[in-house]
Structure formats: structure tokens, C-alpha cells
């Protein structure tokens, strides 16, 4: 017979960001505890609000199953002396297990024979086990910050006020500090601040809802989503999607509703990004936009109650918002009193990173990189790229960015436009921070792309150059994100450039700052790029295709991506498998190859003449297509070699006794191998 467990930890308001992680930890810990206790179950569900963490487990047995437990001891060799008498190791093991030496068994394992003790353990009542498990569970929930309260020697995110613990409807008795577990829960702090008894999980959910608490976070989230969309439509606009804000607000309320208020028109001169950021960061308000994405003069707030008089709530929120936006308007007006370029000098007093110097030094480095990129890829944009790089960090010392760091770049664009800078430069200032997240928007212009690449590469090479290399999950300088961003930009724009050459230039500019050998840094940065590129391409293509194409070179990322795409497409064709077999036959014969020209005069068989002739024709056509990155067409041409290769192997003995003939045949096969290898190493393909 299986039963259910209900655990509710009731506390003062837990910070919204703590709740999801606490619920995940709660589930992880109980799974481990149940496994250790040999208790199976059907399902685990966790739910949470600002005031409660809830755990529900279905399908627990009433009694722990019996078990045969074996404790392993020392090896037989160490347990007995030459006369077969037990040693101190055997006696100590027996004593530790509470048995006589004569009760010890010898068990054969992969590592040899060892002593062991096997005993039968009778299962204990689950209710009894849970009384031991649950206090560990409550005390073990990790929080980013926890606190003590009163004079208690316990810690939690916020003071705990009640605990519900029921197994099969019966209280599981334990204590957490002065709090005793029971069957009494509590309702909404403001709308139903009273206690109520609980019988089981279904009854608990019903009673919570009757007391204005929606325990299920997914239901609260969906309620907020629907209500915000509904209210936004009443303005003639629609909700600006914001999943992270939705997630946060879900854990700020127990019984959500949605109320709309107005933004005073005087503040609409402030860039919409600032208004949205201010409302989002300080007030947790949702924004409303029209069909073109223009901000409308409304906000949506999610109170934790059903307001008796919504107008009172609106007035209160509008009063607070006016104060917030007045600050933003002040910063906006004050910042525009100084030209953006006049702020650049102030970057000399802003430390970017202790070992890498100031933000001004960083700007000078990546400006030089941006100029090189422009000169190589779009010379007409060189001057604008240099100007963008010079100005793009200047807004970091503005009042607005000091108050709202999220609008860096955006304010640079606004201030540049106000100062009369070229529109292309102003837009590129905002674009150079892109992408801000995986799969996010990329720079639309070459200018923005050049500066973005240069800035990110300086960050990557600089950090690697002074030993700030990501380890495990730790990546304080977001180098993985920066590298993925660079790769995404290069592939999106189709830029053909030498990655190693760009890294060399960056390290040259960083020479005075490096604390590690330049060659080591260069190698590590390239490998870091390789790892990120493999991961990105591996999301879309088979691993062996990616590996095969990269083996032919990945210094030009855009070119490598084209070869991966072509190879994957070609792989779907009927002639792919026979071609791969032919190529592998070539590889198996030549090993390291012969670096010598082919001499037709040494041919002894018509098959050699035929293969050489077909190879010359194929090289001519395929090389031209490879040069134009028409790799699928080039592979089609190369596939035409198969019949001639097969005929060659059928007709001649490659490893002839005559060394000149032998080496000439190897040189012929080496030429074929080099043609294949300009696209991929077919030997790395599976199958």
C-alpha cells in the first residue's frame, strides 16, 4: 500500500530569487534521502510562494523494504597470517561489525578475495524514517544568504513560523528550532491571515486557495500572463514580453491580480529603454507597446491582493513611479549638457581590470582591432568604426548609466545622436554590446559588428593573457558568452578572416599587459574558440561531420561552417558512402604521403594514366569551386573520381618493388588525398 507525504515550510517573505533554487534543492535532497532509505515513490512535486516551500511525494510505501546488507572488509591476504590465523585487521573489522571473527565470510570480487559481513535488515516504518529525514531536509536547504533570528542556533532564508508535515494524513513529528511540525497551515498575510488544519495534499491546495493562496507557481505564472495581456489590450496596445520579470513576479505574490496605471507624458521624452528599465528594475512593472514596438504611456503592476479600490492602488503606484522617472529625467537632461566625446577622457580614471588597465586603455586597443577588421572587410567603414570605438564606452561615466547599467550603449547612442554624430556611428555604439545573450540580436551594421568583435576579442585575449580563464561553471568575465557572440557575428555576416591572425594582433596590442607566454595564450584562446565553435555547430550537425570539416582547418570560421553545411548535405546522397570508402582506401595506403610531383613517365598501367587524367580534370574544376566556396558542387566533382580510384586499386599493386614506381603511385594518391582534404578529413566520418 502506498501513501503520500506533504511538507510545507512556512516563513516570512523569502526573496523571489531564492525560491526556485530552494525548490530544486528540496527535490534533489529528498531524492537522495529516499534512495539512501530504500524508499521508492511514484512522483515528487515541489511548489512555492514567497511565504511557503511545499513538497508533495506520491506513492511512498508504508514500510521500508527488508534488505540484505553486505559490509566489505580487508582483503583475505591482509586478514589472515601464513598460519591461517586472523590478523588485527580481521579482528578489528569483526569488532566494528559487532560479530565474532568466525562469522566473517570470504567473498570473491574483481579485485580479489575480501572479508565481508552479510546481515538481514528488517525494514522500518516509513513514518519513523521520515521523522529523521525531514529535519535534515529543512535544515539543509541552501540559500545564497541565510539568517538567524531571536537567539536560535538555526538558519534559514527568513524566519520560519510553521511547518506542516503529514504522511498518510498523520503528523510526522519533528522540530526546527522552536517550531514543531503539525497539520496547521496559514492563509494569505493580508487577505486571510488565519490558520487552518490540513488533512492531505488535495485538501491543502483547496484550503490554501480558499485562504487566497495559489501554491502552484505555474498556475500563478499563467494567471499573471493572462491578466497582463488582458489589461494591456484595454489600452489598444499589447504587453511587452518579459519572461524574466514574469518569473520574478511569480515568486513575489501569492494571489496575483493586474492593475494598469499611466506614465506622465512629460517623461516620454526619455528613451523608452530607460523608462522600461526603471519600471522593471525598481517597481517590477510590465510595459505596454503598440504594434510597432513604441512604448505607450501605461504600466501594469501585479499587486499581491485583490484591491478593494483599484484607483487607490493606481494612485499610489503612479506617485512612486513619478519619483523614479523624475530621477531618470534629471540624469537624461544633465548628461546631455556634456558632449559624449568629452567624457572619453574620464575613462582614464576607470579601472577596467587591475592587470589589464583602464577602460581608456582597453578602448585604444580594441579601436586598433576594429580599424584592422574594417580595413580587411569593409575599408569604407574604417573611419566610422574608429569613431564608434572611441565613443562607445563614454556613456559608462554618465549619470544615467551609473543609475541604470542595463542601458549602457543605448544611452551612448542617444547622446551621440544628440551631439550630431553620424547616425551610423550612433547606432553602432548601441550595437557593439550585441549579442547580450545566447541567440540574441546581432549587430545589424558592419560598423557595429567590427567594434563588437574587437571589444570582445580584447576581453577574451586580455583575460586569458593574465590567467583569468573560465573553470567549470565559474566565468566571471562572461568569456564563453563573448566567444559565442563573436562566432555568431562572424557566421551571421559571413566574414572571411583569419582567426589566428586576429588573435595575434590582439595579443600584440596587449603585449605590455600579458603575464603568461604569448604562445601559450594564443594556443589557449584558439582552443577556447574551437570548443565553442564545436558546441555551436554540434547543435545543428552530426559531431563527426563537424570534426571532419574542422580537421581541414577552422581558422576561417565562416569558411569552415560552409564546408560543414556542404558535407552534411552531401552525406545524404547515394554516392556519399562509396566515395568515403574510396577515400579511406587512399588514406590507408599513403599514411603520411609523398611530397613529390607525379611523373606520368613512370606509369606502367593504363589505370594509372586514366586516374591521373581524371584527377587533373577534377582538380581544375573542383579547385575553382573550392575557391568560390561552392563546396557541395566541388564534392560532386570529386565524387567523380571514385570509379577511376577503384579501377586503379583493382589494376595495380601500389607498393611495387621498384621504389620509383612505388613512390610515384604514392605521390598520385597523395595528390588525391590533398584534394579531398581541402574540404574535410573523410577518415573522421563515421561509417
Swiss-Prot record:
Q: Where is the signal peptide?
A: none
**Pfam families tied to this protein:** DALR_1, tRNA_synt_2f
Q: Name one GO cellular component term.
A: cytosol
User: Which of UniProt's keywords are assigned here?
Assistant: Aminoacyl-tRNA synthetase, ATP-binding, Cytoplasm, Ligase, Nucleotide-binding, Protein biosynthesis
Predominantly, its location class is: cytoplasm
List where the protein spans the membrane: none
Q: Which InterPro entries match?
A: DALR_anticod-bd (IPR008909), Gly-tRNA-synth_bsu (IPR015944), Gly-tRNA-synth_heterodimer (IPR006194)
Q: What is its EC number?
A: 6.1.1.14
A Gene Ontology annotation in the biological process aspect, one of them, is: glycyl-tRNA aminoacylation
Recorded GO molecular functions are: arginine-tRNA ligase activity; ATP binding; glycine-tRNA ligase activity
Q: Does the keyword Ubl conjugation apply?
A: no
Reactions this protein catalyses: tRNA(Gly) + glycine + ATP = glycyl-tRNA(Gly) + AMP + diphosphate
Does the keyword field hold tRNA processing?
A: no
Localization terms from the record: Cytoplasm
Family from the record: Belongs to the class-II aminoacyl-tRNA synthetase family.
Subunit and interaction comment: Tetramer of two alpha and two beta subunits.
Checking PANTHER family in the record gives: GLYCINE--TRNA LIGASE, CHLOROPLASTIC_MITOCHONDRIAL 2, GLYCYL-TRNA SYNTHETASE
- By its UniProt entry, which NCBIfam families does this protein fall under? glyS (TIGR00211)
Please identify the protein, giving its name as recorded: Glycine--tRNA ligase beta subunit
Amino acid at each position: 500500500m502506498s501513501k503520500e507525504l506533504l511538507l510545507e515550510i512556512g516563513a516570512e517573505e523569502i526573496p523571489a530569487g531564492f525560491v526556485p533554487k530552494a525548490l530544486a534543492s528540496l527535490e534533489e535532497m529528498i531524492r537522495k534521502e529516499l534512495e539512501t532509505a530504500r524508499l521508492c515513490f511514484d512522483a515528487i512535486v515541489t511548489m512555492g510562494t514567497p511565504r511557503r516551500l511545499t513538497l508533495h511525494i506520491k506513492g511512498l510505501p508504508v514500510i521500508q523494504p527488508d534488505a540484505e546488507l553486505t559490509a566489505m572488509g580487508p582483503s583475505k591476504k591482509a586478514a589472515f597470517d601464513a598460519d591461517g590465523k586472523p590478523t588485527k585487521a580481521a579482528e578489528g573489522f569483526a569488532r566494528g561489525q559487532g560479530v565474532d571473527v568466525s562469522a566473517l565470510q570470504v567473498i570473491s570480487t574483481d579485485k580479489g578475495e575480501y572479508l565481508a559481513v552479510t546481515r538481514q535488515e528488517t525494514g522500518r516504518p516509513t513514518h519513523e524514517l521520515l521523522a529523521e529525514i525531514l529535519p535534515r531536509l529543512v535544515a539543509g536547504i541552501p540559500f545564497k544568504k541565510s539568517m538567524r533570528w531571536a537567539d536560535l542556533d538555526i538558519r534559514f532564508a527568513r524566519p520560519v513560523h510553521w511547518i506542516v508535515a503529514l504522511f498518510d494524513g498523520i503528523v510526522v513529528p519533528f522540530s526546527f528550532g522552536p517550531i514543531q511540525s503539525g497539520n496547521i497551515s496559514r492563509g494569505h498575510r493580508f487577505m486571510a491571515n488565519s490558520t487552518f488544519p490540513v488533512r492531505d495534499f488535495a485538501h491543502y491546495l483547496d484550503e490554501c486557495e480558499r485562504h487566497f493562496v495559489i501554491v502552484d507557481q505555474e498556475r500563478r505564472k499563467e494567471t499573471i500572463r493572462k491578466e497582463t495581456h488582458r489589461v494591456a489590450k484595454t489600452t489598444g496596445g499589447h504587453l511587452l514580453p518579459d519572461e524574466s520579470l514574469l518569473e520574478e513576479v511569480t515568486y513575489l505574490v501569492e494571489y496575483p491580480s493586474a492593475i494598469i496605471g499611466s506614465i506622465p507624458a512629460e517623461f516620454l521624452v526619455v528613451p523608452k529603454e530607460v523608462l522600461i528599465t526603471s519600471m522593471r528594475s525598481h517597481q517590477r512593472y510590465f510595459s505596454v507597446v503598440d504594434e510597432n514596438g513604441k512604448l505607450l504611456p501605461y504600466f501594469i503592476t501585479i499587486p499581491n491582493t485583490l484591491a478593494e479600490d483599484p484607483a487607490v492602488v493606481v494612485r499610489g503606484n503612479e506617485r512612486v513611479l513619478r519619483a523614479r522617472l523624475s530621477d531618470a529625467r534629471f540624469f537624461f537632461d544633465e548628461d546631455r549638457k556634456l558632449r559624449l566625446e568629452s567624457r572619453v577622457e574620464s575613462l582614464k580614471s576607470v579601472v577596467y581590470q587591475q592587470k589589464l588597465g583602464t577602460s581608456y586603455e582597453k578602448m585604444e586597443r580594441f579601436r586598433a582591432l576594429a580599424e584592422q577588421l574594417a580595413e580587411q572587410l569593409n575599408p569604407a567603414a574604417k573611419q566610422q568604426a574608429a569613431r564608434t570605438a572611441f565613443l562607445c564606452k563614454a556613456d559608462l561615466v554618465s549619470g544615467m548609466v551609473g543609475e541604470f547599467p542595463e542601458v549602457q550603449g543605448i544611452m551612448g547612442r542617444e547622446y551621440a545622436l544628440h551631439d550630431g554624430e553620424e547616425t551610423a556611428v550612433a547606432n553602432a555604439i548601441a550595437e557593439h554590446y550585441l549579442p547580450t545573450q545566447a541567440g540574441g540580436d546581432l549587430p545589424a551594421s558592419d560598423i557595429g559588428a567590427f567594434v563588437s568583435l574587437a571589444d570582445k576579442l580584447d576581453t577574451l585575449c586580455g583575460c586569458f593573457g593574465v590567467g583569468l580563464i573560465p573553470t567549470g561553471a565559474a566565468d566571471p568575465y562572461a568569456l564563453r558568452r563573448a566567444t559565442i557572440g563573436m562566432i555568431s557575428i562572424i557566421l551571421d555576416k559571413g566574414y572571411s578572416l583569419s582567426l589566428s591572425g586576429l588573435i595575434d594582433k590582439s595579443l600584440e596590442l596587449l603585449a605590455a599587459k600579458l603575464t603568461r607566454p604569448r604562445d601559450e595564450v594564443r594556443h589557449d584562446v584558439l582552443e577556447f574558440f574551437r570548443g565553442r565553435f564545436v558546441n555551436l555547430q554540434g547543435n545543428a550537425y552530426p559531431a563527426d561531420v563537424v570534426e571532419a570539416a574542422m580537421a581541414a582547418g577552422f581558422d576561417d570560421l565562416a569558411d569552415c561552417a560552409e564546408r560543414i553545411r556542404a558535407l552534411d548535405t552531401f552525406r545524404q546522397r547515394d554516392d556519399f558512402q562509396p566515395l568515403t570508402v574510396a577515400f579511406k582506401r587512399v588514406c590507408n595506403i599513403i599514411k603520411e604521403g609523398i611530397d613529390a610531383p607525379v611523373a606520368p613517365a613512370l606509369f606502367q598501367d593504363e589505370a594509372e594514366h586514366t586516374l591521373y587524367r581524371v584527377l587533373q580534370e577534377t582538380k581544375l574544376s573542383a579547385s575553382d569551386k573550392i575557391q568560390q566556396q561552392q563546396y557541395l558542387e566541388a564534392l560532386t566533382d570529386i565524387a567523380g573520381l571514385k570509379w577511376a580510384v577503384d579501377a586503379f586499386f583493382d589494376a595495380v599493386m601500389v607498393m611495387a618493388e621498384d621504389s620509383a614506381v612505388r613512390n610515384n603511385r604514392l605521390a598520385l594518391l597523395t595528390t588525391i588525398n590533398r584534394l579531398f582534404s581541402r574540404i574535410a578529413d573523410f577518415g573522421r566520418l563515421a561509417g
